[in-house]
A protein has these predicted regions:
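Acidic-glycine-rich active-site phosphate/pyrophosphate-binding loop
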Residues: 65-79, 159-171, 324
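Acidic/histidine-rich catalytic neighborhood of metal-dependent amide-processing enzymes
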Residues: 96-166, 228-229, 233
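Fold-independent oxyanion-binding glycine-rich loops
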Residues: 42-44, 62-64, 119-121, 150-153, ...
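Metal-dependent amide/peptide-bond hydrolase catalytic core
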Residues: 159, 166-360
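Acidic/His- and Gly-rich active-site-bordering loop/insert found
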Residues: 1-88, 106-111, 330
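Short glycine-aspartate micro-motif
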Residues: 57-59, 83, 143-149, 166-168, ...
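Conserved strand-to-helix beginnings and helix N-cap segments that scaffold or border functional pockets
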Residues: 22, 95, 127-132, 181, ...
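Alpha-helical metal-binding/catalytic segments enriched in His/Glu/Asp
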Residues: 60, 80-127, 168-171, 181-202, ...
Length: 360
C-alpha cells in the first residue's frame, strides 16, 4: 500500500490534458499487456480485465485527462502529507486507487470480476467524452453489476447525479430606431418579468430514494440581436432589439427524464417565448435497490450524499448499470491552482475499496 503515492506521482508526471491522452493510453496499454491482461482500446481509452467467469462484474472507473496545469501544480511532488500536481484530486488519485485494487492478486481472486475502465475526454466537451463510445464498442460492460466512478467525493459515497439541460429562451419583438421606440416592440424589456421570476425562483428539493436533490434554474447568458442563435447578428446600440435570448440552465433531479425536464422549462416559460433545447444530459438514478450498491454502502461506513452535479454515473444509469461516485480526491481542489490530495485520503480510499472488493 505504501507504493500508492508513488503510483500517483507517476500518473501525474504524464502529460494528459484533454485531447492529449494518447501517451497515457499507450502507457496503460503497455503496462497491462505486459502482464498478460486482456486489454481493449477505444481511441484513447483503455479497458483491462474481465474474466467472464460468472462472478458479479465490478467496473473500476476513472478518466485519464486533466484540465490545463498552472505554475503551482505543473511539477508533481510530494509535499509533507499531500501529493501536489494537476489532476491530483480530479482524478488521478481515484485512478491510482482503482489501478492498485485491480492489480491486487487477492482482490482479483475475490468474489468479483474486476474490470478497469480508464477513459479519455471527460474534462472537455460533452460529445468528446469517450465513455459513451467505450460502452457502445464494448457492450459486455453494460451488463456489469456495479460501476464505481472514482471522481473526487471527499471519501463520501455519492449516489446518483443531477441531470443538466441548456435551453435558449427567445423573446420576440419588432425592430425600430431607438429614437422612436414606439414604432417597435422591445424584445429585451419584454423579458423583464420572466427574468425577475427566474431571479426569485427558489431551489426545489426533490427526494429520490431517500436522498434530497436540489433542483435549480439559472440564467447563464443572454444576448440581443437578430434571429441567428447565439447573437451572431449583434444588435446595434441604436436599434430596438427584435429578439432577446436567455440561456436557461436547469439542473434536475434523477426522478425526471430529459423530456420531463424540457416540459418543466416550457411550464416555466408559459408560452411567452420560443424555446430551443441546445444540450441535455440525463440524470443518474441513485439505485439504492441494487444489491452491490447496498453492499458498498454497508461496507464503506461513510457518509451517504446525493450528487449535486452531473457525472458519468448518468452514462451507466442510461444503460442500466448501477453506479456510484466514491473517491479520495477533494472536491474543493478540483481545477484549483496548486491542486493536491492528502496522502491519507489515498490510503483511506484504498482501504474502503479493498474491504468492499474482498467481499463479506
Amino acid at each position: 500500500m505504501s507504493a500508492l503515492p508513488d503510483l500517483l506521482l507517476e500518473l501525474l508526471a504524464m502529460p494528459c490534458v484533454t485531447g492529449d491522452e494518447g501517451p497515457i493510453a499507450a502507457w496503460l496499454e503497455e503496462r497491462y499487456a505486459g502482464r498478460g491482461e486482456r486489454v481493449r482500446r477505444c481511441a484513447n481509452s483503455i479497458v483491462v480485465g474481465g474474466e467472464a467467469d460468472g462472478r458479479p462484474v465490478v467496473l473500476l472507473v476513472g478518466h485519464t485527462d486533466v484540465v490545463p496545469p498552472t505554475p503551482e501544480d505543473l511539477h508533481p511532488r510530494a509535499d509533507s502529507d499531500r501529493i501536489v500536481g494537476r489532476g491530483a484530486s480530479d482524478m488521478k488519485a481515484g485512478l491510482a486507487v482503482a489501478m492498485e485494487c485491480f492489480e491486487d492478486p487477492a482482490l482479483r481472486a475475490g468474489p468479483y470480476d474486476l474490470v478497469l475502465v480508464a477513459y479519455a475526454g471527460e474534462e472537455g466537451a460533452h460529445d468528446g467524452n469517450e465513455l459513451g463510445p467505450v460502452l457502445t464498442a464494448m457492450p459486455d460492460l453494460t451488463t456489469a453489476d456495479l460501476a464505481v466512478v472514482m471522481e473526487p467525493t471527499d471519501l463520501t459515497v455519492q449516489l446518483g447525479c443531477m441531470g443538466a439541460m441548456h435551453a435558449e429562451v427567445t423573446f420576440r419583438g419588432r425592430a425600430a430606431h431607438s429614437a422612436r421606440p414606439w414604432q417597435g416592440v422591445n424584445a429585451l424589456t419584454s423579458a423583464g418579468r420572466f427574468l425577475d421570476e427566474l431571479h426569485h425562483l427558489a431551489p426545489a428539493d426533490v427526494e429520490v430514494d431517500g436522498l434530497s436533490y436540489r433542483e435549480v434554474f439559472t440564467a447563464t447568458g443572454a444576448w440581443s440581436g437578430g434571429p441567428t442563435s447565439g447573437g451572431a447578428i449583434p444588435n446595434a446600440r441604436n436599434v430596438v432589439p427584435e429578439a432577446f435570448t436567455v440561456n436557461v440552465n436547469y439542473r434536475f433531479a434523477p426522478d425526471k427524464t430529459l423530456d420531463q425536464a424540457a416540459a418543466r422549462i416550457a411550464e416555466l416559460v408559459d408560452g411567452r417565448a420560443s424555446i430551443e433545447v441546445v444540450d441535455g444530459a440525463p440524470a443518474g438514478r441513485p439505485r439504492r435497490d441494487a444489491t452491490l450498491v447496498g453492499a458498498f454502502i454497508q461496507m464503506a461506513d461513510a457518509a451517504i450524499e446525493p450528487k449535486q452535479a452531473w457525472t458519468d454515473v448518468a452514462r451507466f444509469s442510461e444503460v442500466g448499470v448501477p453506479a456510484l461516485n466514491f473517491g479520495p480526491g477533494l472536491t474543493a481542489q478540483a481545477h484549483q491552482a496548486g491542486e493536491y490530495v492528502p496522502v491519507q485520503n489515498l490510503l483511506d480510499a484504498r482501504g474502503v475499496m479493498g474491504t468492499f472488493l474482498a467481499g463479506p
